[in-house]
Amino acid sequence: MAKRRKSSRTKEKETNWQERVIQIRRVSKVVKGGKKLSFRAIVVVGNETGQVGVGVGKAGDVIGAVRKGVADGKKQLIEVPLTKASSIPHLTNGASGGASVIMRPAAPGTGVIAGGAVRTVLELAGVKNILAKQLGSDNPLNNARAAINALETLRTFSEVAKERDVPLEHIYS
């Protein structure tokens, strides 16, 4: 009888993903027999080397909700361009719902100066030096999504030079 090898597709690549739960909330749905309770988890997934995603999971128990949130976060991954100083290349803004976020690059040694969900997103993205401010809503999900939105709009100096058809040295001067 021939031995079957496990497919490499089924085995998930382990590249030290970290996950942090931002919020777990008990939610209810009104049905004919009364209220049906479930849990909603907001999870940030990142590898601290420039990839990060925010996911939301709902299940009857907390562990199931977190597991679904992690899976959703891995589907929503974005690439974040980091500088040599582990900061962002330029100032950026992001918005989601009523929340808006402003991010500014910072000098080495500054640290992550941000609050709440935005701080978690930036730390798991691998940003070490940044100044960020949340404006508007204090909803953790909208703030996390606003942070992701701001990080998505970032461009490297080489991308800008290519778009403008100028040499990279011209951008720095």
Swiss-Prot record:
Keywords for this protein: Ribonucleoprotein, Ribosomal protein, RNA-binding, rRNA-binding
Record GO terms (molecular function): rRNA binding; structural constituent of ribosome
Keyword Phosphoprotein: no
Family statement: Belongs to the universal ribosomal protein uS5 family.
Domain notes for this protein: The N-terminal domain interacts with the head of the 30S subunit; the C-terminal domain interacts with the body and contacts protein S4. The interaction surface between S4 and S5 is involved in control of translational fidelity.
Subunit (UniProt): Part of the 30S ribosomal subunit. Contacts proteins S4 and S8.
Function: With S4 and S12 plays an important role in translational accuracy.
Protein name: Small ribosomal subunit protein uS5
Source organism per UniProt: Gloeothece citriformis (strain PCC 7424) (Cyanothece sp. (strain PCC 7424))
Gene that encodes the chain: rpsE
